[in-house]
Amino acid sequence: MSDFKVPPKAKGFKRLFKALFYSKDGLKCAWAEESAFRQIVILALFCIVLASYLTKDFLEWGLLILPCFLSVVIELINSSIEKAVDFTGTEFHPLAKKAKDMASSAQLIGLIFWAFIWGRYLLTLYFN
């Protein structure tokens, strides 16, 4: 067995404060270890800045950045599923492959949604 011990549970604002640090650690880990996460974040930042210049109001801006944030969240979930599956063992198992493939397909759907929203907006902008 490993020497890893689960820290005692905090309560109240202390729990919230600790949760923020756990989230920060998760983002640092994803940035350091997952190239797909870095690519999605860089693309999202570019699109958020571009949306700030292209849109006329807050609603348009919000609708354009929604798929950006959605894809970042999906990539975090995808990466965490991959890490959990890799932790369970190194040998190939069909269920492990299915879990990884389904998580990856969720990201594909998110990226298609992103392309659809931005493509439709840019076409509307171009033809008006």
Swiss-Prot record:
- Gene3D superfamilies in the cross-refs: 1.10.287.3610
Q: Name the needed cofactors.
A: Mg(2+)
Positions contributing to a divalent metal cation binding: 34, 82
Entry's transmembrane regions: 35-55, 58-78, 108-128
> An example Gene Ontology cellular component term from the record?
plasma membrane
**InterPro entries recorded:** DAGK, DAGK_prok, DAGK_sf
Reaction(s) catalysed (UniProt annotation): a 1,2-diacyl-sn-glycerol + ATP = a 1,2-diacyl-sn-glycero-3-phosphate + ADP + H(+)
Question: One MF term in GO for this entry?
Answer: ATP binding
Topological relation to the membrane, as annotated: Multi-pass membrane protein
Please provide the record's keywords in A-Z order.
ATP-binding, Cell inner membrane, Cell membrane, Kinase, Lipid biosynthesis, Lipid metabolism, Magnesium, Membrane, Metal-binding, Nucleotide-binding, Phospholipid biosynthesis, Phospholipid metabolism, Transferase, Transmembrane, Transmembrane helix
Q: Please give the superkingdom of this protein's source.
A: Bacteria
According to its UniProt entry, the protein's GO biological process terms are: phosphatidic acid biosynthetic process
The answer, when asked if Ribonucleoprotein is one of the entry's keywords, is no
UniProt-listed Enzyme Commission number(s): 2.7.1.107
Q: Where in the cell is it found?
A: Cell inner membrane
Active-site residues, as the UniProt record annotates them: 75
The question of whether Transport is a record keyword is answered with no
Family listed: Belongs to the bacterial diacylglycerol kinase family.
Summarize the protein's role: Catalyzes the ATP-dependent phosphorylation of sn-l,2-diacylglycerol (DAG) to phosphatidic acid. Involved in the recycling of diacylglycerol produced as a by-product during membrane-derived oligosaccharide (MDO) biosynthesis.
| Protein name, entry field | Diacylglycerol kinase
**Organism this protein belongs to:** Helicobacter pylori (strain J99 / ATCC 700824) (Campylobacter pylori J99)
Protein encoded by which gene: dgkA
